[in-house]
Amino acid sequence: MSKIRPLGDRVVVKRSEDETKTPCGIVIPDSAAEKQDQGTVVALGPGKKDSEGARVPMEVRLGDRVLFGKYAGQSIKVDDEDLMVMREEDIVAVIE
């Protein structure tokens, strides 16, 4: 993967692979499959600045599995990998 360095409080997330089969074996075509709203954090910005100019540390860490809103962020493609760039506030939870 190319090196991508997000700015401010932005996070780069690699979307989780979509399931193409249901547990009972039914194959779901790409046209009917909904994109999963979860992924793994692969890059972090340095954090946003507060009103006094000090950096606010990021709450998520590299490698965290996260949930995000359906319309969160921007989809990008880097080296044939589908990634999302979003603000940290668009992440709703860390999956532990």
UniProtKB/Swiss-Prot annotation:
Entry keyword Chaperone: yes
SUPFAM superfamilies (alphabetical): GroES-like
UniProt xrefs under Pfam families: Cpn10
Gene Ontology BP annotations: chaperone cofactor-dependent protein refolding
Residue stretches in coiled coil: none
Family: Belongs to the GroES chaperonin family.
DNA damage among keywords: no
Main subcellular location: cytoplasm
Location of the protein in the cell: Cytoplasm
Subunit structure: Heptamer of 7 subunits arranged in a ring. Interacts with the chaperonin GroEL.
GO terms for cellular component: cytoplasm
GO molecular function terms attached to this record: ATP binding; metal ion binding; protein folding chaperone; protein-folding chaperone binding; unfolded protein binding
HAMAP family, alphabetized: CH10 (MF_00580)
Alphabetically ordered keywords of this record: Chaperone, Cytoplasm
Protein name: Co-chaperonin GroES
Function in brief: Together with the chaperonin GroEL, plays an essential role in assisting protein folding. The GroEL-GroES system forms a nano-cage that allows encapsulation of the non-native substrate proteins and provides a physical environment optimized to promote and accelerate protein folding. GroES binds to the apical surface of the GroEL ring, thereby capping the opening of the GroEL channel.
